[in-house]
């Protein structure tokens, strides 16, 4: 390899290192977090003994909050109001931090000066709404399948019955077993 090729490769290597160094802090949020943490720890090593003073919250460069960020958080926390999410995103500047706060169970306050919307008062018609009424009720299987408990079906062969007759037979057999258990 001649001298010009070696010089060219060395120049490419130096250029690559410089470009990586300039782009490093803007490339990934975790890289920004690491540089901010090291900056805070080096500033606070004096009187605090290595611990950050105050709340210990790390200040990150904030991004403007857009609707996509709110939708991501609302997908995980649908019961939160969009203003609560927007306020927390403006404070934290990060969807990840907001989601972590939600998963930890922290409160999401409304922004100062914002009044929470009052849900409209619904009249007492909710109880008469057929969709909200409990439709679960016990069925009387003897009446439903027209089974006479006094009838003797013990001589009937189960495999020879059609579907409806099998249902009646199973209800009759269950009734007889229940009567036998209650007499014991």
Swiss-Prot record:
Q: Where is the composition biased (Pro residues)?
A: 109-122
Region Disordered, as annotated, extends over 32-63, 106-145
Residues passing through the membrane, by range: 3-23
Q: Which residues lie on this side of the membrane: Cytoplasmic?
A: 24-184
Per UniProt, the ranges with Polar residues bias are: 32-45
Carries keyword Endoplasmic reticulum? Answer: yes
Locate the CUE domain: which residues?
65-107
Write down the Gene3D superfamilies for this protein, in alphabetical order: 1.10.287.4310, DNA helicase RuvA subunit, C-terminal domain
Key words of the record: Endoplasmic reticulum, Membrane, Transmembrane, Transmembrane helix, Ubl conjugation pathway
Q: Which Pfam families match?
A: CUE, Cue1_U7BR
Coiled-coil boundaries: none
Which SMART domains does this entry report, sorted A to Z? CUE
Membrane topology label: Single-pass membrane protein
Function (record text): Component of the endoplasmic reticulum-associated protein degradation (ERAD) pathway. Recruits the soluble ubiquitin-conjugating enzyme UBC7 to the cytoplasmic face of the endoplasmic reticulum membrane where it functions in degradation of misfolded or regulated proteins localized in the endoplasmic reticulum (ER) lumen or membrane via the ubiquitin-proteasome system.
To which protein family does this belong?
A: Belongs to the CUE1 family.
Complexes and interactors: Forms a heterodimer with UBC7.
Q: What is this protein called?
A: Coupling of ubiquitin conjugation to ER degradation protein 1
Supply the source organism for this entry: Eremothecium gossypii (strain ATCC 10895 / CBS 109.51 / FGSC 9923 / NRRL Y-1056)
């Amino acid at each position: 390899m001649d001298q010009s090729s070696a010089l060219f490769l060395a120049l490419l290597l130096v250029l690559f290192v410089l470009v990586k160094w300039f782009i490093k802090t803007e490339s990934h949020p975790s890289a920004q977090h690491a540089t901010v943490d090291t900056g805070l720890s080096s500033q606070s090593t004096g009187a605090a003994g290595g611990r950050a003073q105050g709340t210990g919250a790390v200040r990150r460069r904030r991004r403007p909050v857009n609707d996509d960020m709110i939708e991501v958080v609302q997908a995980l926390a649908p019961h939160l109001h969009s203003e609560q999410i927007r306020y927390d995103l403006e404070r934290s500047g990060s969807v990840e931090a907001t989601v972590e706060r939600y998963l930890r169970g922290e409160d999401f306050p409304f922004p100062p000066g914002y009044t929470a919307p009052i849900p409209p008062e619904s009249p007492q018609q909710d109880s008469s709404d057929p969709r909200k009424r409990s439709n679960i009720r016990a069925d009387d299987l003897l009446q439903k399948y027209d089974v006479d408990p006094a009838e003797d079906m013990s001589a009937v062969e189960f495999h020879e019955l059609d579907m409806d007759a099998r249902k009646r037979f199973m209800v009759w057999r269950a009734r007889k077993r229940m009567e036998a258990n209650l007499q014991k």
